[in-house]
């Protein structure tokens, strides 16, 4: 994980639960403590989880570290008349350039997770078969951005869109606009810190911000020594 330019090996907590008849006995808290102890013993200094109850995990020492922004845009609001010098090509999900692009993005983006093979397998595990990946290339054939999307019931669902520079950002929006005869609406996720409304001529769109991941330091001395 990139934490302000430093690469950290982090642990994950997932599927923490107890049977209803055993709730209120502190079992989950003990499981959590045991998990964090094992992470610390394996030389990890930071841990992440996706909370189902923010107040609960706050009481256990976790705090929100990132937000997830979602947006809904009408087809008439998609930026148009862009003429970036590069081009977009669709690729398979296991394309090496696609995955390498995410690694380059992670290296320059605070809070971004590096993905290994297992992470990529999990990334696409629940996606529908016609989910597509499109890469933006410069005029010199250098990949600088991508988007993962699905078109269903006249709606383009953008699972992820990242770009390394302004040209790739505009080039991908140009690609989205090229689907104007096929879609009535665009729904997407935005992991950047800036709302996208400022990018549109018609900024009257729906954007929502929700807490995404929670984290906590599990080895203060090791964390600071790596920082």
Q: Residue locations for each model-derived region?
A:
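Conserved active-site alpha-helix within GNAT-family acetyltransferase domains
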Residues: 41-45, 51-69, 171, 193-209
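Conserved acetyl-CoA pyrophosphate-binding loop and the N-cap/start of the following alpha-helix
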Residues: 22-34, 167-171
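Intrinsically disordered, low-complexity, positively biased terminal segments
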Residues: 85-227
């Amino acid at each position: 994980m990139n934490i302000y330019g430093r690469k950290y090996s982090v642990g994950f907590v997932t599927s923490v639960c107890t049977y209803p008849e055993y709730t209120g006995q502190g079992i989950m808290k003990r499981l959590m403590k045991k998990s964090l102890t094992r992470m610390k013993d394996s030389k990890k200094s930071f841990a992440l989880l996706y909370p189902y109850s923010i107040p609960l995990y706050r009481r256990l020492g976790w705090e929100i570290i990132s937000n997830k922004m979602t947006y809904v845009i009408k087809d008439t609001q998609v930026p148009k008349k862009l003429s970036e010098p590069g081009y977009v090509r669709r690729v398979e999900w296991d394309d090496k350039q696609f995955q390498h692009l995410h690694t380059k993005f992670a290296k320059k983006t605070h809070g971004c997770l590096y993905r290994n093979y297992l992470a990529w397998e999990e990334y696409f595990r629940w996606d529908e078969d016609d989910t597509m990946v499109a890469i933006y290339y410069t005029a010199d054939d250098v990949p600088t951005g991508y988007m993962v999307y699905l078109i269903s019931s006249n709606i383009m669902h953008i699972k992820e869109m990242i770009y390394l520079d302004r040209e790739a950002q505009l080039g991908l929006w140009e690609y989205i606009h090229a689907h104007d005869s096929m879609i009535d609406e665009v729904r997407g996720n935005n992991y950047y810190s800036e709302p996208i409304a400022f990018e549109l001529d018609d900024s009257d769109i729906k954007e929502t911000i929700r807490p995404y991941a929670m984290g906590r330091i599990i080895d203060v001395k090791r964390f600071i020594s790596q920082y």
